[in-house]
Design a protein with these regions (language model features):
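Residue-level preference for alpha-helix termini and adjacent loops
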Residues: 31-33, 82, 128
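Disulfide-stabilized cysteine-rich extracellular repeat microdomains
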Residues: 39, 82-85, 105, 131
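Conserved, short, structured surface segments that act as functional micro-motifs
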Residues: 63-69, 89-146
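A generic structural motif
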Residues: 29, 37-39, 72, 80, ...
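A generic structural signal for solvent-exposed, polar alpha-helical segments
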Residues: 12, 25, 83-85, 117-119, ...
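Zn2+-dependent peptidoglycan hydrolase active-site motif and core
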Residues: 44-84, 110-112
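Surface-exposed, glycine-biased beta-strand/turn segments
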Residues: 1-63, 93, 106, 152-154
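Low-complexity, Gly/Ser/Thr/Pro-rich intrinsically disordered linker/tail segments
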Residues: 143-155
Length: 155
C-alpha cells in the first residue's frame, strides 16, 4: 500500500462543527468545519489530482474541489470563495488550491468544510484520519533501515 502524508487544509486549528455533529444531523457530506474568514488560503491535504472543480454555488456544497490521492483517498473542500486549480491538475501537499468562503445554500457563515472519503466511498472523520496518518508516518520512520538513512562514505 502507498503511504501518503496528509496535513490540515488551513492554518487554523479552530473548528466549530465536527464529524460526529454532521453525522448526528444526518448530513449527506459529513466532515469537519474550520472557522476561517472568507479569503483564507486553503491547502491540498496531500499530493494528488484535482478531479472536481465546481465553481457554481448551486447547492449546499457551494463552490468546491475534490482531490484524489495516490492511496485511493479523496478530500473534498466546500463553501469556497475562489478556486485556484483546474480539473486534471496535479497538486502537492501544501499547495494553495482555493480561498475559503461562504458559498452554498446551507452555509451559515464563512468557513472551510473538509470531507475525507476512503477508497470504498465511505466518509471518515478527518480528525481521526489525520491522527492515524501521523501514527503511520512515525511507525514507518521507526522501521526504516539504517542503510536507507545513513549516507555511504568511502574509506
Amino acid at each position: 500500500m502507498t503511504f501518503v502524508k496528509y496535513s490540515p487544509p488551513c492554518k487554523t486549528k479552530d473548528t466549530n462543527d465536527d464529524f460526529k455533529a454532521h453525522v448526528a444531523r444526518g448530513s449527506s457530506i459529513p466532515g469537519l468545519d474550520y472557522n476561517c474568514p472568507t479569503g483564507t488560503k486553503v491547502f491540498a491535504c496531500a499530493d494528488g489530482e484535482v478531479i472536481v472543480t465546481d465553481e457554481v454555488a448551486k447547492d449546499g456544497t457551494g463552490i468546491s474541489i475534490e482531490i484524489k490521492h495516490p492511496d485511493g483517498m479523496h478530500t473534498r473542500y466546500l463553501h469556497l470563495s475562489k478556486i485556484q486549480v483546474k480539473k486534471g491538475q496535479k497538486v502537492s501537499r501544501g499547495d494553495t488550491i482555493a480561498l475559503s468562503g461562504a458559498t452554498g445554500t446551507t452555509v451559515t457563515g464563512a468557513h472551510l468544510h473538509l470531507s475525507v472519503v476512503d477508497k470504498h466511498g465511505k466518509f471518515v472523520d478527518p480528525d481521526k484520519w489525520f491522527d492515524k496518518n501521523k501514527k503511520e508516518e512515525k511507525a514507518l520512520a521507526a522501521t526504516a533501515t539504517p542503510e536507507a538513512t545513513t549516507p555511504v562514505t568511502e574509506a
